[in-house]
Structures are given as C-alpha cells and as structure tokens.
Amino acid sequence: MSRRKSPDSPLFQLEPVLPDFSFEITAKRDGFWPVAGADEAGRGPLAGPVVAAAVILDPDAVPGGLNDSKLLTAEQREALFTEIMATATVSIASSSAAHIDATDILKASLDAMRRAIDGLSIAARFALIDGRDVPQGLPCHAKAIVKGDSRSVSIAAASIVAKVTRDRMMARADATFPAYGFALHAGYATVRHRSAIDSHGPCSLHRMSFRPFREAQEQPLAVSTGPIDPN
C-alpha cells in the first residue's frame, strides 16, 4: 500500500499564483483596446485622502513581479512604481478627507477611480476595476473584478501606484502635522495614531465622518500652514 504524501512534500509546494494578462487579452479579443486597470489606496485610514490610479501597461514591457501592493514590501513597491511610471500610461486622482465626509468612502473612492481613468493621456476602451463596483460615468466599457489586484497585472500595477503615491502624500503631511506621526502609519488606526488624536484632537486631514470622530466634532482642529502637494 502506498503511503500518502506529506503536505511538506515538494509535490505539495505550489508556486503562488500571480496576477496575469488574461483579462486584458480577453478584452482585446472582444475588440476593446487599450485596457486600463484601476485601483485605490486608503479606504480604511482615519486620516488623509483616498488615492486612485489607472494604468495602461505596454504588453511588451510589463514589469516583472507585479502583485497586489499589500503583498509587497515598501522597497518592492517603490522599485515597481519607478518601472511602471517609466513604461506605462498612468493617471492618478484623489478624494480628500472633506470629499469623503461630504459623500462617503465608497462614493469618494469610485469618483477618484473615474477621474483617474478620465485623466489617462491615452483613452482606455476598457477598464478593469478592483472590487465589486464600477464607477458611474466612465468614458469606456468596464468590468469589476473582486480581488482584481491579485488577478490582473494592470490592476496590480494601479494598486502599487496608488499605494506609493498615497504613502508619499502622508509622509509629506507629517511635516505639516508632526504630532500625529502620519509618516509612520499613513493615517491608519494604530495605537500611536489613536493616542495622538486623544492628546491633540483631530486635524483637518482626519475623516470626521469616521468613528471615533463623530463623537468628537466639538474638538478644535489643528491649523495647516498650507496645502499639501499630492505629487
């Protein structure tokens, strides 16, 4: 009788599945080209904008190692960001904390993705959108793909561009609002960030429609010395 293979056997050591060009190829076969991938970064933080990117990759110059930005190190993201910006058509848009508060985080995210796709210097004929929802008012056909940043290389590239751009914006915001440590946590609800909010109250970058701010609307805002350049 043969013995069952152990899960530690090399036969069970499968390579991780990386995003590929399948969705883009299907769209091209259906007569839609070029194809853009779109994704956002920063839906969950308590502070800062949500940033969206749209990317049209050159099929002959797709950077190696593209993946969901959350699965990459900061160093890997920075290196891929540089390569994407050098070889692809890229557009970036953002929705501020005030925009998020005036609408909601989903609407603000979808609006940023729409503006990013609209802003491409080469018009996309099809857009692959990360998530369950397609932004309204797009200038092209589109398809929403759940976990698209781990399935489509174009969406993966957009996720990297959005993440690196937002992290850089929050690092610059740290100079204007040094008490909050934005360069360390990018506005996410870390212990340090929550402690700073408890000590100093919210600032103008905080999303007042998010908890815990709904119960602290009366606290004074920190004063910005000027606008924060998103680039």
From Swiss-Prot:
Native species: Sinorhizobium fredii (strain NBRC 101917 / NGR234)
GO biological process, any: mismatch repair
Pfam families in alphabetical order: RNase_HII
Reactions the enzyme catalyzes: Endonucleolytic cleavage to 5'-phosphomonoester
PROSITE patterns in the record: RNASE_H_2
Assigned EC number: 3.1.26.4
HAMAP family listed in its UniProt record: RNase_HII_B (MF_00052_B)
UniProt GO MF annotations: manganese ion binding; RNA binding; RNA-DNA hybrid ribonuclease activity
Subcellular location as annotated: Cytoplasm
InterPro entries referenced in this protein's UniProt entry, alphabetically: RNase_HII, RNase_HII/HIII, RNase_HII/HIII_dom, RNaseH-like_sf, RNaseH_sf
Protein name, entry field: Ribonuclease HII
Function: Endonuclease that specifically degrades the RNA of RNA-DNA hybrids.
Cofactor: Mn(2+); Mg(2+)
Binding of a divalent metal cation, residues: 39-40, 130
GO cellular component entries: cytoplasm; ribonuclease H2 complex
Cofactor descriptive note: Manganese or magnesium. Binds 1 divalent metal ion per monomer in the absence of substrate. May bind a second metal ion after substrate binding.
UniProt record similarity statement: Belongs to the RNase HII family.
Domain RNase H type-2: 33-222
Enzyme class: hydrolase
Alphabetized NCBIfam families for the sequence: PRK00015.1-3
Keyword terms: Cytoplasm, Endonuclease, Hydrolase, Manganese, Metal-binding, Nuclease
Major location (coarse): cytoplasm
